[in-house]
């Protein structure tokens, strides 16, 4: 240390110092001009002058050898006179008296040093400076070393006197050590010299412990020093913003990860601030070692100030166009802070949060809800119980001007850094009260900008050790440290919260701010967080899974509910073990959350790894079966509903690479983990064309769902199934087949059929034994028709090639599919050889359905593959059959017209008009056998593919019961509908009825009392035998629509019903009654029974 200039008698030289940077002082009155340049406090500028925009230094003037005072160097300023009492202004100089020390004897020095040691130890329990001073002086002589934490000072009698071993030291060094010991009563135990906020090691060497008090003596710095900006041109509004930014951990992490750091003004801000801090710490150590404290307090601080001012000026220039600020004019950080963040979008995102203002007037009822996204929101007149999760304040109503109405801010998405502005301050200054949890994250106040009444802003920073840094640019180049937050509640101006995630990893932390408020409850309500609400969108998050699922599989998040997911485990955020080790890596899509019921189809979501969810196998199976039941209930639905499901699946399904054979089973073992393995992976390239066999996939899917209580859950890929629902005819067939496999849910399904004409399908399901095959097939064909028919024989679609390629391809495709199925398990007796091929296929179709429901997965894959191959071959074979079909139909039409003329002659006889009922019963015997044989010969000429195609399009529903106890009257009552065809019956149509009955002239009418299962089966078989050409497609064989309806009615004459029943139901009164019954026919289609 360099002493002040002295004269011969030892007194300091009168007058100002000669140090560089010290201005010359004028006379200061009776106090004298004894100036000590080394005694410059940390707040070396006059606060009174600084408020006026001036920078004047405070100098120390010594009144006597024992007392001194600080005065402003400005002659016009009287600070501190008038601000405090004179007794407080004049401070006794106990620590550092510059009384000249004359040479003393060694004995007197020993006694004075011992006294100083005892005095220092009595003031501080952890004072190691005195002992360390002995250690330093005794380091070369192996002096005794004591623990620094010991509060017991050894007795002087039992301790080697450190001064006695210092004979080689000069007297000025002894005096300096003595002075240091006197000055360490206020020094802390540790001093940060590394710039990282951590105390320096205490065992690095003996010299470091002597340097620490020297450093503190020369600089008067508090613990954990941090540089700060000095006030200039009334820029405290900008300095407080910069101080808050440089201490933000979230901002540091974000700026560090930037690609183009040099272009970021925030990166330059942090860089300059770190350079200033580094300059401070390195200069401290070098200055202490060199013994030049004056250089540390003057030149180094000038360099630090220059470094900080450079970046401040740059930011000020950047803000000037938007803020329109000028030097010397006071601005507000409320306006400057958001504008500064807008300079860089990626930085602004750290502060942007979305919320809504909810307001409802208690007087007039006026209410509104406005959504906003801002980085800083202003609150005024907050309620006494204000909290970030109860952020309400009083305000007037815009409608009735009623005051003291409450408006509340509801947070929707909170940014990592959350800022609010309070005009009147907060209700209380206990900042721990305002910490809150949101979406699994803790938000804690880390910075507060204080506003004083004299238009001055100060930033308070929460340090890691719980202390607070006061960054006041009026208080020198370094911030001050306080143990407590010492800001009145009314002066809290801007509050900054930062997100604290100490119990989760970085990867999960990235997904937490992406969650919605309604997906989970805040932790402040002490409710656990659902695993399904955490979206890990990147592919890297899936690497933590024990198995890798196919990339085209969407994972369903909603199979386990939130309550179930946390029932068997600990709180996910209760510790690092809860969420770090047992996190569930699910790959979720945004659209899956919108279609939770649909996403249950993808059962491969059970790639579970976490113990809380997978701990109980029973719960997992129960939830899986529940979702499967909901799937089965929705499978038997209308084409319009399936169209909706298809549209929803378009967004969440990937390109179908594995259609129906790539299945995975999730097996739960005792170690609460899941092993996923492939159950059946058949290599079939044709499976990519899933549209060829939608119904086969549906049956295979339902087969998987109907196997509960197994050790393995067998989810199946059904995304391609739903996305390929394009043809309503196939959809209706597969839906009806599904109803067979769900017998226990038949009542529920019958109540949930919403499509037009669903009552007809229910009618056929209950009364298939009575209705002929051609009628039921015709009904299904017309239901799936998309276009209304064109009336008239000339425009009849059966005699045209319009659309024949599409229809024939679809029919032939189904025929190959049915033919490729396994042999039937059981079927009724076969008919005559002329229709063996036709009769066998519906039973083969039904048998394949039974096999699929019993669990034959490979069979479903084989059928799917064969469907694809045969569908292409049938399209090529189409043109060859088309011409022959057309010729045979024309030939049959000519024969039917010839027979109609004979029937007209029979109708003209008086007997047939008189006894109508007898004629109806005898007409089947009046036809000659040659007529019947000629027609049957013609029918036998029809090729096999035509018969197969007609059977595939017109076969009865294989899933319904063939034997029903419903009466014929009930069936007819439901079947008859107010269509134009049924209300225009004529005598010609009745003649057609009688003529068509001639085909079964060799079959006697059944006895009415023999209406049992056997007779019904025989009737169906015989009816199928004769009517097979008609059943091929009634709309293509009959010349007009009246003949088709006549066919329906004539075939029913085989039953024991009387003709008066038909007269009753075909009367106009009965038809009108059915037409007016809106409950039975809510959405009836007038084209239901019409033909092309």
Swiss-Prot record:
Residues 821-832 have a biased composition (Pro residues). InterPro entries: DUF4650 (IPR029388), Papain-like_cys_pep_sf (IPR038765), Peptidase_C98 (IPR028890), USP_dom (IPR028889), USPL1 (IPR033505). Residues 145-168, 185-207, 713-749, 797-859, 904-930 are annotated as: Disordered. GO terms for molecular function: deSUMOylase activity; SUMO binding. It comes from Homo sapiens (Human). Residues 227-500 form the USP domain. Keywords: Hydrolase, Nucleus, Phosphoprotein, Protease, Thiol protease. It is found in: Nucleus, Cajal body. This is SUMO-specific isopeptidase USPL1. GO terms for biological process: Cajal body organization; cell population proliferation; protein desumoylation; proteolysis; snRNA transcription. Residues 148-163, 197-206, 732-748 have a biased composition (Polar residues). Interacts with ELL. Changing residue 236 to S: Abolishes the SUMO-specific isopeptidase activity. The keyword Hydrolase applies. SUMO-specific isopeptidase involved in protein desumoylation. Specifically binds SUMO proteins with a higher affinity for SUMO2 and SUMO3 which it cleaves more efficiently. Also able to process full-length SUMO proteins to their mature forms. Plays a key role in RNA polymerase-II-mediated snRNA transcription in the Cajal bodies. Is a component of complexes that can bind to U snRNA genes. Residues 236-495 are annotated as: SUMO-binding. The modification Phosphoserine is found at residue 909. One of its GO terms (cellular component) is Cajal body. The active site is at residues 236, 456. Its main location: nucleus. Its EC number is 3.4.22.-. PROSITE patterns: USP_3 (PS50235). Residues 810-819 have a biased composition (Basic residues). Belongs to the peptidase C19 family.
